[in-house]
């Protein structure tokens, strides 16, 4: 059997479950009205588009999206952008909100979110179940992970990557492996992570992406559901309980293409979210959104092209080293090193630099904005200065991050708020 046919069979026998119910509390007010997977990224996408696109580009066409926290905008986006699958061809992207199938509780943890959907998974009759994190921005060929799982004879395989020890502390599940990548130890979010052999600066962290043999997964979930002491979490409970008696392997994260650097970003803080967007402005970014070999799919709104108007000496509509999305109007203003999402309007004599501006923002005249994240629908009053003096920003009610990025939301401006 050819390798292509072998991989095709594996992906057809797989059901992917994307866990997209998290809030992302370290993003503060940016996720007050949306789940983290619904957060905007890269000028026109949402975070959920990346694991969904990875599934499609990897050949996995049966996907469930598990939702819970403030899920309205996430559900709306998935329905609009991912409803083109053909059920008659065995394709589907289904939304799986918490529905109290097995108890009166909502999803209590990552393992419980899967457990409460066992009946739906069983109906699909998959040989393998892939459980994926829905709140990271990354590009990954899941077919390689599936092939490694099948060839090793593992009961479970955990996708992993090397991260700095300081970065992993309290943030990631950390594992120990032998020379064959079999997992010998696993600790969820330790404060003192164990480093990789021979490299005290790095540790092996879980990406929150798992592959299970289906019946093995069901057995472990049912056993966990009967344990009153469990937190119902894969990292805290399931993995530590099975590594001694079962075959659990780690799979090193790698690029979807040879000779390319693998791309993965945890955009779980204001600083990391801002930086990951800024990285896209490089002439050769680590994440190439223009790569036709691995397209990122999303809901495509019907919008007019961006427009730049006025070319006078004292006001010139221009943008440099920036991403400007459809429907934007730069009217006698200057935009430098910034990411503007759709339908942003920047009015005359204003300057926006080194900033991420989400959809439907209006920046009125004579504003100066730098090192900022402006949330959707904000109307920045005329003459407002943001990002130049952190004390002044805080006095206005804006949030300033650890590394000096200023967040502005509608609520901070006294504007009505709601689901986005």
Curated annotation (Swiss-Prot):
The protein's annotated pathway: Glycan biosynthesis; glycogen biosynthesis
Main enzyme class: transferase
Stored SUPFAM superfamilies: Nucleotide-diphospho-sugar transferases, Trimeric LpxA-like enzymes
Coiled coil: none
Domain of life: Bacteria
A biological process term (GO) from this entry: glycogen biosynthetic process
EC number: 2.7.7.27
Record-linked InterPro entries: ADP-Glc_PPase (IPR011831), ADP_Glu_pyroP_CS (IPR005836), GlgC_bac (IPR023049), GlmU/GlgC-like_hexapep (IPR056818), NTP_transferase_dom (IPR005835), Nucleotide-diphossugar_trans (IPR029044), Trimer_LpxA-like_sf (IPR011004)
The reaction(s) this protein catalyses: alpha-D-glucose 1-phosphate + ATP + H(+) = ADP-alpha-D-glucose + diphosphate
GO molecular function: ATP binding; glucose-1-phosphate adenylyltransferase activity
Residue positions binding alpha-D-glucose 1-phosphate: 107, 173, 188-189, 206
Keywords: ATP-binding, Carbohydrate metabolism, Glycogen biosynthesis, Glycogen metabolism, Nucleotide-binding, Nucleotidyltransferase, Transferase
Family membership noted in the UniProt record: Belongs to the bacterial/plant glucose-1-phosphate adenylyltransferase family.
Biological role: Involved in the biosynthesis of ADP-glucose, a building block required for the elongation reactions to produce glycogen. Catalyzes the reaction between ATP and alpha-D-glucose 1-phosphate (G1P) to produce pyrophosphate and ADP-Glc.
Subunit structure: Homotetramer.
Official protein name in the record: Glucose-1-phosphate adenylyltransferase
């Amino acid at each position: 059997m050819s390798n292509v046919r072998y991989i095709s069979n594996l992906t057809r026998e797989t059901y992917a479950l994307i866990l997209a119910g998290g809030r992302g509390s370290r993003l503060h007010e940016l996720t007050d009205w949306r789940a983290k997977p619904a957060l905007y990224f890269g000028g026109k996408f949402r975070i959920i588009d990346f694991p969904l696109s990875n599934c499609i580009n990897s050949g996995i066409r049966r996907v469930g999206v598990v939702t819970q926290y403030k899920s309205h905008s996430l559900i709306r986006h998935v329905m609009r952008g991912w409803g083109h699958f053909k059920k008659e061809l065995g394709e589907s992207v289904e939304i799986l909100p918490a529905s109290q199938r097995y108890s009166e509780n909502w999803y209590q943890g990552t393992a419980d979110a899967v457990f409460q959907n066992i009946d739906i998974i069983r109906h699909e009759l998959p040989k393998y179940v892939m459980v994926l994190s829905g709140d990271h921005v990354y590009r990954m060929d899941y077919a390689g992970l599936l092939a490694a799982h099948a060839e090793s004879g593992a009961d479970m395989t955990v996708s992993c990557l090397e991260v700095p020890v300081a970065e992993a502390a309290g943030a990631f599940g950390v594992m120990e492996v032998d020379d064959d990548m079999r997992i010998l130890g696993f600790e969820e979010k330790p404060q003192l992570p164990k480093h990789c052999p021979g490299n005290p600066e790095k540790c092996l962290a879980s990406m929150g992406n798992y592959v299970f043999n289906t019946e093995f997964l069901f057995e472990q979930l049912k056993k966990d559901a009967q344990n009153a002491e469990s937190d119902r979490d894969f990292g805290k409970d399931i993995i530590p309980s099975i590594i001694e008696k079962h075959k659990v392997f780690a799979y090193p994260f790698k690029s979807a293409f040879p000779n390319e650097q693998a791309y993965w970003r945890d955009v779980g803080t204001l600083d990391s979210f801002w930086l990951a967007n800024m990285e896209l402005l490089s002439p050769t970014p680590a994440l190439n959104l223009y790569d036709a070999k691995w397209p990122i799919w999303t809901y495509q709104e019907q919008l007019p092209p961006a427009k730049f108007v006025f070319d006078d000496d004292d006001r010139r509509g221009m943008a440099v080293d920036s991403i400007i999305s459809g429907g934007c109007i730069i009217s006698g203003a200057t935009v430098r090193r910034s990411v503007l999402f759709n339908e942003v309007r920047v009015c005359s004599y204003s300057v926006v630099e080194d900033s991420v501006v989400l959809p439907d923002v209006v920046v009125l005249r004579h504003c100066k904005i730098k090192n900022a994240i402006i949330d959707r629908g904000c109307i920045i009053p005329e003459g407002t200065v943001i990002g130049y003096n952190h004390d002044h920003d805080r006095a206005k009610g804006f949030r300033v991050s650890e590394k000096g990025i200023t967040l502005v939301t509608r609520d901070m401006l006294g504007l009505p708020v709601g689901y986005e």
